[in-house]
A protein has these predicted regions:
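Short cytoplasmic-facing helical segments at TM-TM junctions of multi-pass membrane proteins
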Residues: 205-209, 295-296
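Short pre-active-site segment immediately N-terminal to the catalytic Zn-binding motif
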Residues: 192-207, 283
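Catalytic or ion-translocation cores adjacent to nucleophile or general acid/base/metal-coordination motifs
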Residues: 119-121, 224, 228-232
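Catalytic Zn2+-binding segment of zinc metalloproteases
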Residues: 210-228
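His/Asp/Glu-rich metal-coordinating catalytic cores
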Residues: 160, 188, 203
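Hydrophobic or amphipathic, alpha-helical segments that drive membrane association/targeting
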Residues: 1-183, 398, 409-442
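Post-HExxH zinc-binding segment in Zn-dependent metallohydrolases
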Residues: 230-255, 299
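Cytosolic-facing loops and C-terminal tails of multi-pass membrane proteins
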Residues: 1-50, 82, 86-88, 254-288, ...
Length: 442
């Protein structure tokens, strides 16, 4: 057990020689662009974080145990957990169905008071219904006519991993990527964050596609229709049940007492729903993380192990990419942190005096390429030490990298040539300019 890390301190601007570590006396890192820390004892390796909660410690222990089993080749399928999770999901869906059918029965066969109650319950049933996701629309959506080269590359990767062809590709401004099946028709949607796409080389982009399409075939129960909608429904219920602050101006004693009682009831309901969310998370986390490891292996099979490793390493550089984009936005000075938005602003609302978008992406790539090995090592060590960063579907990045290293090096099954890469870049070019302009405008 290591000591809690102190807040990450910036390196002195004139750091020419290594200063001694205040904890162990070894030399600190000296690059003035990054936090200075001690590679010997991990002093200042990351910001100080609160002690992990019981739920976070249990999640970290499950992640470690699954990694050990997969590395040893002895990881049985969690059938018992799947059955329990399916039963819990059935209760969630039955609750929604009972509320809906009960409200209809009151509306059809009840008296006036019962019909009023049925109308209120019907509104609740509609609000609490399962969400199937919506097919995205807007500027970032690319269809096959607009981007034949990108879809052609995506189809080759999907065929390699055994996944159906994607229905829609969406470009947004996040340093991330995702794959989902949405709508009643269950259309496959691939979302590519342009900052991440621009940070990767051609082969790493194929690894990214292989990983995302791997989610279609890796047996992730959390993404199934029955379990996935139950998890999202429970999360919606929890968000709605959390009490907020209601300001009614002048309030009588009776109103204040009523507010206190309602607040206590909502807090109790929210607590129960949170326990249900965490229960489902615990029951499905093993299958979700196992599926994530399988998606990594499919990325390695598609693009080669080296490219898959490079993809995971680049994902650790999200904060550094945000720094580069913020500096470009503010002309080299300090600027606010780039925050993920629900939608990308249109080019018409962006600043007309924004720098050349190509220069923005070039600066980001140059900054990421200039990050020294010791800083990359710090990010990986902090990922190893941060026990609060484990979620139900994504194992820690350091464990994913370690498991890739357990297997043999795989060659790339899919490659892209200069002509295909240039065609894909040309199809994305208008969106590169639009998203860059929106990011620069803040």
């Amino acid at each position: 057990m290591t000591e809690p890390s102190s807040p990450v301190l910036p390196a002195p601007a004139d750091a020419a020689a290594a200063e001694p570590c205040p904890r162990c006396g070894a030399g600190l890192t000296t690059d003035p662009r990054f936090a200075f820390w001690c590679p010997t004892c991990d002093w200042n390796v990351g910001p100080e974080r609160p002690e992990p909660t019981r739920h976070e410690r249990a999640a970290a222990a499950r992640a470690d145990r699954l990694h050990r089993e997969l590395a040893a080749g002895t990881s049985p399928t969690a059938r018992r957990e799947w059955l329990l999770a399916s039963a819990a999901a059935t209760l969630v869906h039955l609750s929604t169905a009972a509320l809906f059918l009960g409200s209809l029965a009151l509306l059809v066969a009840g008296n006036t008071v019962q019909r009023c109650l049925g109308g209120v319950l019907l509104v609740f049933a509609v609000v609490l219904r399962p969400r199937f996701g919506r097919v995205p629309r807007g500027e970032g959506v690319l269809d096959r006519e607009q981007a034949p080269a990108l879809y052609g590359l995506a189809d080759r990767v999907a065929a390699e991993v055994g996944a159906p062809r994607v229905d829609l590709i969406v470009l947004d401004d996040d340093f991330n990527a995702s794959f989902g099946v949405v709508g009643l028709r269950r259309r496959a949607v691939l979302t590519l964050g342009l900052p991440l796409w621009e940070a990767l080389d051609d082969q790493q982009r194929i690894a990214l596609l292989g990983h995302e399409f791997g989610h279609r075939v890796n047996g992730d129960n959390r993404r199934s229709f029955w379990l996935g909608t139950a998890i999202s429904t429970l999360a919606t219920w929890y968000d709605l049940a959390r009490p907020g602050r209601l300001h009614l101006g002048v309030r009588t004693l009776l109103v204040r007492v009523g507010e206190m009682i309602a607040d206590l009831l909502l807090k109790a309901l929210a607590w129960l729903l949170l326990q249900a969310v965490q229960l489902l998370d615990g029951l499905t986390s093993r299958a979700g993380q196992q599926a994530e490891y399988l998606a990594d292996s499919l990325a390695a099979r598609t693009a080669g192990t080296e490219a898959a490793r490079g993809l995971l390493t680049t994902l650790l550089l999200r904060g550094s990419a945000e720094v580069a984009l913020t500096r470009a936005r503010s002309g080299g000075g300090r600027g606010p942190r780039i925050v993920r938005r629900r939608g990308v602003r249109s080019a018409e609302t962006a600043r007309t005096d924004a720098p050349n978008p190509d220069l923005l992406w070039e600066r980001m790539r140059e900054h990421l390429a200039s990050i020294p090995a010791v800083e990359r090592d710090r990010l990986l060590r902090w990922n190893t030490l941060d026990r609060t960063a484990v979620d139900g579907s994504h194992p820690p990045t350091h464990l994913r990298l370690a498991l890739l290293g357990h297997g043999p090096e795989q060659p790339a099954a899919v490659r892209t040539g200069p002509e295909e890469a240039a065609a894909v870049a040309a199809e994305i070019a208008p969106h590169r300019a639009r998203i860059a302009a929106a990011l620069l405008a803040g």
